[in-house]
Regions:
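Charged, compositionally biased non-catalytic regions
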Residues: 4, 12, 25, 41-56
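Secretory targeting and sorting signals
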Residues: 1-23, 81, 216
């Protein structure tokens, strides 16, 4: 069985300074019961929400997420978001990004998109752990929405080697100091790269921070949000800053 490349993320306590939650949320006392509300609006969003930066992206920006209870926890919702592999060719091949939503437990304010960093850590797992990560006022007022960035997790993951091949590659000499060892090292690296290309296809060339940030704007539109309310940790702050540079008028 093949294994996607994994990068262990550090779940930092520092939150993104670039895109902040700027809304006050009324909390409840611990003794007050809470019920799961309908987490997202059912009416179509205004045209200003789904307006695409490029006319060729209009269909993708108008998509709505079909949420269903997650298999792992039916209290959470799972879905997918369709994005182009290459934004320079918006009518070309597409991939689906994995999404997970923890519905607001109280009076809903909106959606909060989160990313744990890495780069490459699964945002769906981060959102699923929301109760252990975020304070109660945030959980009451916001749907916590996580996504696996393109090329990671369940979002068209980059794939290279089988488990056995990866073990053999990692067991190689990382510091070659003879001509023979240098040649062996070079051959193994080239083979690794070639297998990544063969197994992953065109998505391998499109797993950049800029493309992940553009994916977040498609997600904002699909969530029916006029502006993106976002919280990132570690590398997630870079992703948030990149989004703010690309879409300054869409920052919440």
């Amino acid at each position: 069985m093949k294994k996607a490349l994994a990068i262990i993320a550090v779940f930092a306590l520092a939150l993104s300074a670039f895109v902040a939650v700027g809304l006050a949320i009324r909390g409840t006392t611990p003794d007050e019961p809470t019920a799961r509300p309908t987490p997202s609006p059912t009416t179509p969003p205004p045209a200003s929400v789904t307006e695409a930066p490029d006319e060729a992206l209009a269909e993708l920006y108008s998509q709505r997420i079909e949420w269903e209870p997650c298999d792992t926890n039916p209290d959470n919702d799972c879905g997918t978001l369709t994005v182009p592999i290459d934004y320079a060719e918006p009518e070309g091949e597409t991939i689906d990004l994995a999404l997970l939503r923890v519905p607001a437990s109280g009076a809903r304010v909106g959606s909060l998109v989160v990313n744990p960093g890495g780069p490459g850590a699964p945002g769906t797992s981060y959102a699923a752990a929301a109760a252990n990560v975020f304070r109660q006022p945030l959980l009451e007022g916001f749907d916590i929405v996580g996504f696996d960035p393109r090329g990671t997790g369940d979002s068209a993951p980059v794939d290279c080697l089988s488990d056995r091949e990866l073990d053999a590659y990692l067991a190689g000499d990382p510091t070659p100091d003879t001509p023979v060892e240098e040649q062996s090292f070079e051959e193994s690296v080239l083979s690794f790269g070639a297998q990544c290309v063969a197994a992953s296809g065109p998505v391998l060339g499109h797993v950049t921070t800029i493309e992940a940030a553009r994916d977040m704007d498609v997600l904002r539109s699909a969530l029916g949000e006029e502006q993106l309310t976002y919280l990132g940790a570690s590398y997630g702050t870079k992703l948030g800053a990149t989004y703010a540079e690309l879409f300054p008028d869409k920052v919440g």
